[in-house]
């Protein structure tokens, strides 16, 4: 797999929520379920695929100096939170359906068990 850093390919909302959790000292463990709402093209089912890419993304979650500098330039993040992001790496547990089975809308494809600020980016 590649070593591409896709960390900033997230909604800005997720990062602002993380800053709110950071400021309030809220970083309890959570369980997030990953699922999809509708089959692509209104098909009757889907096939679970892409787990290697998801794991690669999670393993490479981090904020580079340029990422943090970009976020600083937005003028909405506090310096102590940006410092936290500069040392960010995911730690937690991932439970996922293996590649290949047929899956349906609202089936849980993956559970993310981690501190809320880490789970938020997965």
What are these regions (language model features)?
Residues 1-122:
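Ordered alpha/beta subdomains of enzyme catalytic regions
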């Amino acid at each position: 797999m590649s070593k591409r850093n896709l960390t900033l390919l997230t909604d800005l909302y997720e990062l602002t929520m993380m800053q709110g959790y950071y400021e309030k000292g809220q970083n309890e463990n959570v369980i997030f379920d990953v699922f999809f709402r509708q089959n692509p093209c209104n098909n009757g089912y889907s096939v679970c695929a892409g787990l290697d890419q998801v794991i690669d993304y999670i393993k490479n979650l981090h904020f580079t100096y340029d990422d943090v500098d970009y976020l600083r330039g937005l003028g909405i993040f506090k310096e102590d939170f940006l410092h936290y992001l500069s040392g960010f790496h995911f730690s937690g547990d991932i439970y996922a359906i293996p590649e290949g089975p047929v899956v349906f809308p609202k089936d849980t494809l993956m559970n993310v068990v981690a501190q809320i600020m880490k789970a938020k980016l997965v």
